Amino acid sequence: MILFDQLTRNCFRGTDRAFAYDGAALELSRRLTKDTELVNELPASVLHFIGSPFLHSENLEDHDMALALNGVTLAKNETAAMYARPHIINHRDIIARFGRYPHRNKAMERDNTEEETAWLESDEVPGWAKSQMK
């Protein structure tokens, strides 16, 4: 999970290569979370990494899964879950608004909509999104 989801994001910031293994990471997260017994046994720190690909997905249903996983984390480590929750909601809100992450458009060779351009030029863009913009 760390190799597919985190390493590429940090090594290849601002390029399409940052997202090259998102599909593999997401598939692994989906497979792992289907096993509810396993999910209930794992510590909060592991659930955090299993949940990351859901946050990085441009599918709103995956963000709902991240919120559900955060609920499981809450029962194990309230502090960790409450720290992560605003970040999960922030990511989800962007997907709900645009249907994708506008800050990836340049790297993914996608055209911005007018609304996306206005957002990208605003102070609303979170730091984690700015870090992927070149």
Give, region by region, the residue ranges found by the protein language model.
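Intrinsically disordered, low-complexity activation-like regions
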Residues: L3-K134
